[in-house]
UniProtKB/Swiss-Prot annotation:
Keywords: Carbohydrate metabolism, Cytoplasm, Fucose metabolism, Isomerase, Manganese, Metal-binding. It is an enzyme of class 5 (isomerase). Belongs to the L-fucose isomerase family. This is L-fucose isomerase. GO terms for molecular function: arabinose isomerase activity; L-fucose isomerase activity; manganese ion binding. Gene3D superfamilies: 3.40.50.1070, L-fucose Isomerase, Chain A, domain 2 (3.40.275.10), L-fucose/L-arabinose isomerase, C-terminal (3.20.14.10). Its cofactor is Mn(2+). Homohexamer. The active site is at 337 (proton acceptor), 361 (proton acceptor). It is found in: Cytoplasm.
Length: 591
């Protein structure tokens, strides 16, 4: 089966079409802007899969309708998913703009005095606004000389932010969300909303009963040689934690081996269902070998599966990590309890950063006073105002232990193409696999247990659906916190100590939901959240605006908020603008 090509970035150099001196004097400068933009993007960006980003430049500068149409024909044949229009001069606004209604688009108007690039930028954006096709504005803060071919830092930041978000939009379009099972324990996020995926993300939902997973395991619809490799890898790398079950519920060695085997098989079969596996065709399973073209998935698990079969914790944790028995590779996006809305937040974070995502319960707010009462310890530093306990039995990527290191030796989570095998091994070494608690998981299983290193910047996100409004996005930038071991142990043993933990301290602003840490917890819209490495809330905001998803809560500095220029016409408060603009334009793929 032919591999689906990755979306490309289209670069549209536009120019003043007047011949006999004007156009001729601008051709080289205009095309050089396009080439410089393409060079920047190809150097600084990668797709989430790790592949290099490709740019497609119009064959000629665009002065009017004919050249715009020729450019569009080229872009259509090359899978261009977003466009950047560049110019150093006046051009003919509505005659030269990109009119595709769903493709993210930006315009960079050169800030120079010789020719009025800013005037074209304003005219073109006015046309976009009038026609209901929002576009992003890029205009340098400082005047440049006409022969200056450099890209200023503020322009570069906007070009890269737009491109990261635009690539995420283009990469999700046409893919599917694999809903493996149904609603888990009444969790609203697992009431999978097909209209949301279709209208806002351009995706389909593939609904598959969990009996399909059972069928694949029982009928050996998998690569048996790979299973043996996975078992050998687990035997070498898995460290097992204590079994906290009562004696009558503890499994013997043979039973535990069967649980491990099935857990690894679940990982293999869910992966094969998502992306396909050509080796299944070799054993006569051609239909199953194709997969479901899923860029994200969710597994219901509880309780209809987990009351009799091993839970999804091991499978989910390994799939969401950047490595397994096949080595370092791109992490998958698999939401525990089939929480599709948390899965979408995971998908956004992965597409923007190329990193694994940490799925967690937003479990407990610990005030400084409560911690001091329980442990005698007084919080300080990043934790001085209190912390949130992020913990879940399921799909927290092992990368979340933060045993990888950045260029300065700090703990982090890297894009998978930067992770060494030694760093993957360190994450595995920092993880214990604890037998699942019988009261929760009667069919057994293994839960990963690790503790996230402290001082690491994270962005916590969540998508919620509000009746009458549609989807909204929540964002909270902050840091992981490291507590003294005895303090962590006391707090952790008050909940389920066999699960992975991140102690999270959001950055406070003193206003609204970020007045204090309690307010962050109180305003969080659901029981789950996602941790993405770094303070990348601004990228989430830009991506959300492209999809027409308003942001209902964030602590990103106002100077970093970057949305289409038409948002400014929807009022004077930037967050109110966001709601009104998203309502006005409606979902990106209106249905």
């Amino acid at each position: 089966m032919k591999k689906i090509s990755l979306p490309k970035i289209g670069i549209r150099p536009v120019i003043d079409g007047r011949r006999m001196g004007v156009r001729e004097s601008l051709e080289e400068q205009t095309m050089n802007m396009a080439k410089a933009t393409a060079a920047l993007l190809t150097e600084k960006l990668r797709h989430a899969c790790g592949a290099a980003v490709e740019c497609v430049i119009s064959d000629t500068c665009i002065a009017g309708m004919a050249e715009a149409a020729a450019c569009e024909e080229k872009f259509s044949s090359q899978n261009v998913g977003l466009t950047i229009t560049v110019t150093p001069c006046w051009c003919y606004g509505s005659e030269t703009i990109d009119m595709d209604p769903t493709r993210p688009k930006a315009i960079w108007g050169f800030n120079g005095t010789e020719r009025p690039g800013a005037v074209y930028l304003a005219a073109a954006l006015a046309a976009h606004s009038q026609k209901g096709i929002p576009a992003f504005s890029i205009y340098g803060h400082d005047v440049q000389d006409a022969d200056d071919t450099s890209i200023p830092a503020d322009v570069e930041e906007k070009l890269l932010r737009f491109a990261r978000a635009g690539l995420a939009v283009a990469s999700m379009k046409g893919k599917s969300y694999l809903s493996l099972g149904g609603v888990s324990m009444g969790i609203a996020g697992s009431i999978v909303d097909h209209n949301f995926f279709e209208s806002w993300l351009g995706m389909k939902v593939q609904a598959v009963d969990m009996t399909e997973l059972r069928r694949r395991i029982d009928q050996k619809i998998y690569d048996e040689a790979e299973l043996e490799m996975a078992l050998a890898w687990a035997d070498k790398n898995f460290r097992y934690g204590e079994d906290e079950n009562n004696k009558q519920y503890q499994r013997n060695a043979e039973q535990s081996r069967a649980v491990l085997r099935e857990s690894l098989l679940m990982a293999m079969c869910i992966r094969d269902m998502m992306q396909g596996n050509s080796k299944l065709a070799d054993i006569g399973r051609v239909e199953e070998s194709l997969g479901y073209n899923a860029i994200a998935a969710g597994f219901q698990g509880q309780r209809h599966w987990t009351d009799q079969y091993p839970n999804g914790d091991t499978a989910e944790a390994l799939l969401n990590s950047s490595f397994d028995w096949n080595g370092v590779r791109e992490p998958f996006v698999v939401a525990t309890e089939n929480d599709s809305l948390n899965g979408v937040a995971m998908l956004m974070g992965h597409q923007l950063t190329g990193t694994a995502q940490v799925f967690a319960d937003v479990r407990t707010y610990w005030s400084p006073e409560a911690i001091e009462r329980v442990t005698g310890h007084k919080l300080d530093g990043l934790a001085e105002h209190g912390i949130i306990h992020l913990i879940n039995s399921g799909s927290a990527a092992l990368d979340g232990s933060c045993k990888q290191r950045d260029s300065e030796g700090n703990p982090t989570m890297k894009p998978h193409w930067e992770i060494s095998q030694q760093e993957a091994d360190a994450c595995l070494a920092a993880t214990e696999w604890c037998p699942a608690i019988h009261e929760y998981f009667r069919g057994g299983g293994y839960s990963s247990r690790f503790l996230t290193e402290g001082g690491v910047p994270f962005t916590m996100t969540r998508v919620n659906i509000i009746k009458g409004l549609g989807p909204v996005l929540q964002i909270a930038e902050g840091w992981s916190v490291e507590l003294p071991k005895d303090v962590h142990d006391i707090l952790n043993k008050r909940t389920n100590s066999t699960w992975p933990t991140t102690w999270f301290a959001p950055r406070l602003t003193g206003k609204g939901p970020f007045t204090d840490v309690y307010s962050v917890m109180a305003n969080w819209g659901a029981n789950h959240g996602v941790l993405t490495i770094g303070h990348v809330g601004a990228d989430f905001i830009t991506l959300a605006s492209m999809l027409r998803i308003p942001v209902c809560m964030h602590n990103v500095e106002e100077t970093k908020v970057y949305r289409p220029s038409a948002w400014a016409a929807h009022g004077m408060d930037i967050e109110g603008q966001d709601y009104r603009a998203c309502q006005n334009y409606g979902p990106l793929y209106k249905r």
